[in-house]
Design a protein with these regions (language model features):
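Conserved C-terminal helix/tail region of periplasmic/extracytoplasmic solute-binding proteins
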Residues: 365-400
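Bacterial signal peptide processing site
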Residues: 23-26
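Extracytoplasmic ligand-binding site segments that recognize negatively charged/polar headgroups
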Residues: 56-70, 106, 111-259
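Periplasmic-binding protein-like
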Residues: 138-139, 236-242, 281-305
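Early extracytoplasmic/lumenal segment of secretory-pathway proteins
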Residues: 36-120
Length: 400
């Protein structure tokens, strides 16, 4: 499982031209087999050995709950008892932080979003995963396996954790008629100037690209994460125009709930869990997956190529997607579970229906975050696409 930085790893990084991170890719129904750049040559673990006694994780808040935040929310303690692996969790706030932490070699596994995954693969910081050592993998929805954000040339680099779509949420008393298009937030002459909200991340450029993909076909956009310079410039220009109408860029979903509750925001990008929270607080909001489709996220548990506790890491990956635990974390975090059997074990029996867990037709219109790279992931070989580092620079310019 250990490896050194080789010239091949450097070559892979150079080919990708990657920098910071947050990501995107195609729908669950596309690109089986994943991305096709050449990563460092690493071997997946072949067999499981004895527990090393502990595992060091990097995770999003809510993914490795041990009862310390809420005594009723704890799936770590039983894991420790059953496996003998003490869980040490470092909660990360951004994909960039996750990538930086993984590079230290001090952690065994990470719950990486698509915008971080390819960077970890290209740098040699993440190793291939032997899915045969993860028995619960067989019950993961097929639409989450072997995708651009979690595999390369048919080689799996992680275990799917869950998924969610970026929805269009609106105040039903302030926004009329009910919107069914992203034009509600991208129309330069919007009636809701100063009340539009947008997700605060460079990956949001993909949302603009998706809108242009559907409304300006002459640009030739086939994948919102594969933009040549002309396509990228068009998306950036659209977002610069939108900036005049944006009252707030959000990254903390509780702050977005507050903004809709106060009336500071009336329409914008949101998540299902935000909608549920706002409605529970009696905020008059609804959300829709617009006719153009949407971007979305699917997190993946990846193992470090320098893992000091790989057996415990594999045990953790199998545990976190086991039906009961996957149901618990999906409800607590607010997402669709990755394990199909989890749907019968949720406390809210409508959870999987609400989050479209088994509705693959729904996910066909969701373009999951995947790291934009110089090698166009839409299959073009006669041009270069704009890599994520340039997205980061452009995002600063967009926000002014």
């Amino acid at each position: 499982m250990r490896l050194n930085r080789t010239s091949r790893a450097a070559a892979a990084l150079g080919a990708l031209l990657l920098a910071t991170a947050c990501s995107s890719s195609n729908t669950a129904a596309t690109s089986p087999g994943g991305s096709d750049f050449t990563p460092p040559k690493l071997a997946a673990q072949k067999t499981l050995g004895k527990s090393e006694g502990q595992v060091n994780l990097i995770a999003w808040a809510g993914y490795a709950e041990d009862g310390s935040n809420d005594p009723k929310v704890d799936w770590v303690t039983d894991f420790e008892k059953q496996t003998g692996c003490q869980v040490n969790t470092k909660t990360a706030g951004t994909s960039d932080e996750m990538v930086s932490l993984m590079k230290t070699g001090q952690y065994d596994a990470v719950s990486a979003s698509g915008d971080a995954a390819l960077r970890l693969i290209a740098s040699g910081d993440a190793a291939p995963v032997n899915t045969e050592l993860v028995p619960n993998y067989k019950d993961v929805f097929s639409g989450l396996k072997d995708q651009q954000w979690n595999s390369v040339k048919g080689v799996s680099y992680g275990i799917p954790h869950g998924r969610g779509a970026n929805l269009l949420m609106y105040n039903t008393k302030k926004v009329s008629p009910a919107p069914d298009s992203w034009s509600a937030v991208f129309d330069k002459s919007s009636s809701y100037k100063g009340k539009v909200t947008a997700y605060d991340s460079p990956i949001y450029i993909a949302d603009a690209a998706l809108y242009l993909m559907k409304t300006e076909p002459s640009l030739g956009i086939k994948d919102p994460y594969a933009l040549d310079q002309k396509q990228f410039d068009a998306a950036v220009d659209l977002l610069k125009d939108q900036n005049a109408n944006v009252g707030e860029y959000w990254s903390d979903y509780l702050k977005e709930v507050s903004a809709f509750k106060s009336g500071d925001s009336v329409v914008g990008t949101s998540w299902q869990v935000i909608l549920n929270t706002a409605q529970a607080e009696k905020v008059p909001v609804k959300a829709v997956l617009p006719k153009e489709g949407a971007t979305g996220w699917s997190d993946t548990w990846m193992i470090s190529a320098k893992a000091k506790h790989p057996n415990c890491a594999y045990n953790w990956m199998n545990w976190i997607i086991s039906p009961k635990v996957n149901a618990q974390v999906a409800e607590y975090f607010g997402e669709a579970p990755s394990n199909a059997k989890a749907c019968t074990l949720t406390t809210d029996k409508n959870h999987c229906t609400t989050y479209h867990a088994a509705d693959e037709s729904y996910w066909k219109d969701v373009h999951f975050w995947t790291t934009p790279i110089a090698q166009c992931v839409d299959g073009r070989t006669d041009t270069k696409c704009v890599p994520y580092a340039k997205w980061v620079q452009a995002w600063t310019e967009i926000k002014g």
